[in-house]
Structures are given as structure tokens and as C-alpha cells.
């Protein structure tokens, strides 16, 4: 039996789509030196090659893909977006504006200089900034711009072409810049990280190991009584000295949870909770007494929960003010915008931050009620909220403003982005509303992006040879300029206008470019995870600004003549 692969794929859009995705994902795993191609560029390259062979796909799949992607971007940004926008993120907001704004202006200038159309210009901006949100925003605005069909088709094809030609240029140039730009300025990143660590009491170890606390019990002997010298637990400060916390005391057969006024007596049996290295720091007088193995004394349900910061008595306060250890709880991680932060007693908490806390189940629940709520550990998505806000986003995108002879539509990209932000924000404030497991959100976002990339590549592939020959050299130059010049401008602005610490500044710059591989290089150079503070500060707002940049470049283009 003979099977005509070409006829088979052309006659089945679903089969073609998944063939493109599978081949593209395989290609995306290849590495050029230390740089991995990535899923986006892998799918785009495969779809462009198949597009040259005149394979095509239904445009509805393309539209659904970009809608799912941009909506999920909004949901991820929502919990921290408003806290960054309105409060302590002024510097981060300004850095993101400078990065995105300068790239937009440079792209517009180069597009006019080289005589490109809006499709090539917007695609070049998206690729050079390695930003799919720019591509999504520009494509959606083009489709709703009222451009005549032949010109629209050409612009959309060129949009994909510009992105494909400059994506790797943007990625590689930024990674190289992240490696060498810190060496061209007079402040060493490692020194800057240590400086901010000393000022704020930060843990600079980028590879800090996290252990679960363990519980051990001891009988109080004469040496321990002598060591306490009649002081109560508050005066002894055992936690401050060792990191262990006395959770329970058995005295005369009665089990109790001690307060700070309790004084240890001969024959007491005490249960201490702490990390393994904290137990090793205990005074020898603890271990010289007999270790006790008693079911009732050791029967403690140690849990680890993720607590979402929500309540007013926690938002805007420093970690130290929560006094977690006074409540017998241990902080393992601080996560903001899916990014792990340094554990810093002086870090100011934002609404939507996630604290991973270990301790006795009752104590962890008490802490959670004080500062927010325990994140739901469920695999069930609130599909009703997902669909409802998706509909709201589409309806917002239909809004059009008329100014004299000029009309401006919000568009699906901006509408869905705004609706996603609102869903994410409300989820951070209401524990049972709009829950989407992070794994499910990642899957929908990634799948939507891959479907979108497959669609744009198949539609643009037929004209790639002509386009590559005409603008290939120009694209190389433009891609390098748009990728690196805004980074330099952003550095100068942050270093000499905002006077930011260099470790935080370089992290914030990589966040404004939403480039995780470059961020890893900055952290390695600083030998610290402190740059993650800056990265988290700009990442959420930059995703939103980049989407708006894709819309704005299409709106501004006709006004430039």
C-alpha cells in the first residue's frame, strides 16, 4: 500500500499540526554550543520549512493558540502586577519602560531606514527581544487594523519572517552580553551582591540546600539545668543560638506546649524541632542527657505548606516582622512570580508572594490564617472562572475608540491579557476562586504558544526564500542593535539615574528582557541568587509592556508616513 504523505497531511489539519509540533519540539532540544534552540524556535523552523512545501493550516487554530498563550501570561502576572505597579516597584517599572520603550523606538527607526513594511519591523522587534508577546500583540492588531487583504497577508507573513530571522540573534547576543557586559563596568557583581547582602541581611548562597525540620527529644539532666542557670526559655534564646525550637515539655507525666516563661527543671523531657544542622549546634549539655524515644512526645505532624500572602497585616511588611520562629514555624522558600527569592529578613512582602513554611500542622495553619491562606493542593482547575474571564477578555478586545478620522481598537491580545491579570489577581486574594494548578497553566500556555508558532510558520513559509535574500543582512544588523542597545541604555539609566545596586540592576535588566538563560548567567557571575530580586521585580510588568509594544508598533507605524 502506498501512502502519499503530502496528501495525508494536507487533508488533515490536526495531523499536520501535531507532526509540526513533534518535529519542532525535537529540533528545539538541539544545542548550539551552550545555547539550546528552544521549543519556540524549533517549531517555527519546522513550520517554515513545511510551509515552503505549501502545507497550510486552518487560521482558527492559530488564533486559539495565541489567545490561550496571552491569557495565561496575564494569569501568571496577575498576583504581583499591581503591587509592582503601585508600590515599591517604581524603579523596576521605570527600568522595564526604558527597556521596552527604547527597543520600540529603535525598531521603528530601523524599519523606516531600511524601507521595511510593518510586518518585518514588528517581527524584527519581537525576535530581537526574544519576546513572543510582542509577536502576538502585533499579529492580533494587524488582523484588526483594516488593512486590505493582500497587504495584510504580506504583513503577517513578514511578521513571522522577521521573528524567525532575528530570534536566535537576539537570544545569543543577550547571553553574550550578560556574560561580558558586567565585566565592562567598574563594579564587580560578586562584590555588589555581597554589599546588598550585608545591608539587608540576605543569604547570598545561590545553591542553598533546604531540609525539612526534624524532631528529637531529650531528658533534662543536671548539666542542662546548670547551663540554664534558672533562666526561662525567652531569656535563654535557644532558637537564636541554635535554630532549634522547644515544641513540647513533659513534666510529671503531663505533656504541654511551653511559653517563653517556662523554666527547665530536672527530669523534664523536651521535644526540639529544627533543621539537622541546628540540632548539631545544641549545647553539649542537651546531648549529655539521655535522648528520649517516646511516641507521645515525638508524635508531631510536621507539614510543609505553601502560604499565599494576602492579608493587610502581612502585605508591605518585612519577613522578620512575621516572627515565624516565635510560632514554631520554619521558612524554606520565598517565591515571587514563579521565581525563588533569597531568604531575607528585610525583604518586603507583596500580595501574591508564596512562602513555603514547615512546622507543626496546627502552627502552620495559624500562621497561614494570619498572613493569607494555604495554597490549594489540587489537580482540579476552576474551568468556570477560566472560561468566564476568557469571554470577558474577548469582549474587552472588541472595544473600539474613535478619534476624529482615527480609530483604535483594544484588540484580543490586550483584552485577554487584562482579563488574565484580573483572574490572577483575584486568585491571589481569594483562596477558592479561579484556581489553576501551575502545571496545568504551564501546559496550556506552552501548547497555545506552540500552536501559534506552527500557524505563523506554515503561513509564512512559502515566501521565506525571497524574503531572506532581500533583507537577511539588514536583519542581522537590526537584530543586534535592537537586542543590545536597549540593554546598554537600561544599564546607564539604572546605574547613573536610579543609582541601583549592580547585582539588582543586572537582574532587573534580564527580567525586563524576560530571558531566563541570561538571568542564570548573571547569577553565576554574581555567585549569588540576589539578582533574582531584580529579575522578579521587572519580569511581570515587562511581559505586559511587551504585549502592548506589539500593539503600539502597529498603531504608530502609519502615523510615521
Swiss-Prot record:
Keywords: Cell membrane, Membrane, Repeat, Transmembrane, Transmembrane helix, Transport. One of its GO terms (molecular function) is monoatomic cation transmembrane transporter activity. GO terms for cellular component: plasma membrane. The chain crosses the membrane at residues 8-28, 32-52, 66-86, 94-114, 158-178, 383-403, 406-426, 447-467, 475-495, 537-557. GO terms for biological process: potassium ion transport. It comes from the Bacteria. Disulfide bonds: none annotated. It is a multi-pass membrane protein. It is found in: Cell membrane. Its main location: membrane. InterPro entries: AAE_transporter, RCK_C, RCK_C_sf, Transp_YbjL_put, YidE_YbjL. Residues 200-288, 292-373 form the RCK C-terminal domain. Belongs to the AAE transporter (TC 2.A.81) family. YbjL subfamily. PANTHER family: K(+)_H(+) ANTIPORTER SUBUNIT KHTT (PTHR30445), TRANSPORT PROTEIN YBJL-RELATED (PTHR30445:SF10). NCBIfam families: PRK04972.1 (NF003440), YidE_YbjL_dupl (TIGR01625). This is Putative transport protein YbjL. It comes from Salmonella choleraesuis (strain SC-B67). The lineage of its organism: Bacteria, Pseudomonadati, Pseudomonadota, Gammaproteobacteria, Enterobacterales.
Amino acid at each position: 500500500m502506498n501512502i502519499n504523505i503530502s496528501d495525508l497531511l494536507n487533508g488533515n489539519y490536526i495531523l499536520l499540526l501535531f507532526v509540526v509540533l513533534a518535529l519542532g519540539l525535537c529540533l528545539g532540544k538541539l544545542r548550539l554550543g551552550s545555547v539550546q534552540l528552544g521549543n519556540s524556535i524549533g517549531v517555527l523552523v519546522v513550520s517554515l520549512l513545511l510551509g515552503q512545501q505549501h502545507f497550510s493550516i486552518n487560521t482558527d487554530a492559530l488564533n486559539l493558540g495565541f489567545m490561550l498563550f496571552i491569557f495565561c501570561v496575564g494569569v501568571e502576572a496577575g498576583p504581583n502586577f499591581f503591587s509592582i505597579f503601585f508600590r515599591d516597584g517604581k524603579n523596576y517599572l521605570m527600568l522595564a519602560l526604558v527597556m521596552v520603550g527604547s527597543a520600540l523606538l529603535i525598531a521603528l527607526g530601523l524599519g523606516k531606514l531600511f524601507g521595511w513594511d510593518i510586518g518585518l519591523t514588528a517581527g524584527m522587534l519581537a525576535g530581537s527581544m526574544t519576546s513572543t508577546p510582542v509577536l502576538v500583540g502585533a499579529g492580533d492588531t494587524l488582523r484588526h487594523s483594516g488593512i486590505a487583504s493582500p497587504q495584510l497577508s504580506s504583513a503577517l507573513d513578514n511578521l513571522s519572517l522577521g521573528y524567525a530571522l532575528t530570534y536566535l540573534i537576539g537570544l545569543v547576543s543577550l547571553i553574550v552580553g550578560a556574560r561580558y557586559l558586567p565585566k565592562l563596568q567598574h563594579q564587580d557583581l560578586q562584590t555588589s551582591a555581597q554589599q546588598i547582602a550585608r545591608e539587608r541581611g540576605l543569604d547570598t548562597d545561590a545553591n542553598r540546600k533546604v531540609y525539612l525540620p526534624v524532631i528529637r527529644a531529650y531528658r533534662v539532666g543536671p548539666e542542662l539545668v546548670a547551663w540554664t542557670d534558672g533562666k526561662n526559655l525567652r531569656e535563654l534564646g535557644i532558637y537564636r543560638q541554635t535554630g532549634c525550637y522547644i515544641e513540647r515539655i513533659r513534666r510529671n507525666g503531663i505533656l504541654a506546649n511551653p511559653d517563653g516563661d517556662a523554666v527547665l527543671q530536672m527530669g523534664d523531657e523536651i521535644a526540639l524541632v529544627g533543621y539537622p544542622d541546628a540540632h548539631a549546634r545544641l549545647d553539649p549539655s542537651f546531648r549529655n542527657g539521655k535522648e528520649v524515644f517516646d511516641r507521645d512526645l515525638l508524635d508531631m505532624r510536621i507539614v510543609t505548606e505553601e502560604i499565599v500572602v494576602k492579608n493587610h497585616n502581612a502585605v508591605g511588611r518585612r519577613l522578620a516582622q512575621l516572627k515565624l520562629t516565635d510560632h514554631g514555624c520554619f521558612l524554606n522558600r520565598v517565591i515571587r512570580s514563579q521565581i525563588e527569592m533569597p531568604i531575607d529578613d528585610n525583604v518586603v512582602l507583596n500580595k501574591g508572594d508564596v512562602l513555603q513554611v514547615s512546622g507543626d500542622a496546627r502552627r502552620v495553619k495559624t500562621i497561614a490564617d494570619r498572613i493569607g491562606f494555604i495554597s490549594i493542593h489540587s489537580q482540579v482547575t476552576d474551568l468556570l472562572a477560566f472560561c468566564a474571564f476568557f469571554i470577558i477578555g474577548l469582549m474587552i478586545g472588541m472595544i473600539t475608540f474613535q478619534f476624529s478620522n482615527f480609530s483604535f481598537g483594544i484588540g484580543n491580545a490586550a483584552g485577554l491579557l487584562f482579563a488574565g491579570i484580573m483572574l490572577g489577581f483575584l486568585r491571589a486574594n481569594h483562596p477558592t476562586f479561579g484556581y489553576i494548578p501551575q502545571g496545568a497553566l504551564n501546559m496550556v500556555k506552552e501548547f497555545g504558544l506552540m500552536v501559534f508558532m506552527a500557524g505563523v510558520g506554515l503561513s509564512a513559509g512559502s515566501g521565506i526564500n525571497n524574503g531572506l535574500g532581500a533583507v537577511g543582512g539588514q536583519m542581522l544588523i537590526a537584530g543586534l542593535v535592537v537586542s543590545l542597545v536597549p540593554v546598554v541604555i537600561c544599564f546607564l539609566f539604572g546605574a547613573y539615574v536610579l543609582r541601583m545596586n549592580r547585582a539588582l540592576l543586572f537582574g532587573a535588566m534580564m527580567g525586563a528582557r524576560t530571558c531566563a538563560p541570561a538571568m542564570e548567567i548573571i547569577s553565576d557571575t554574581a555567585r549569588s541568587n540576589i539578582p533574582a530580586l531584580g529579575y522578579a521585580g521587572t519580569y511581570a510588568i515587562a511581559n505586559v509592556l511587551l504585549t502592548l509594544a506589539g500593539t503600539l508598533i502597529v498603531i504608530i507605524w502609519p502615523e510615521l508616513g
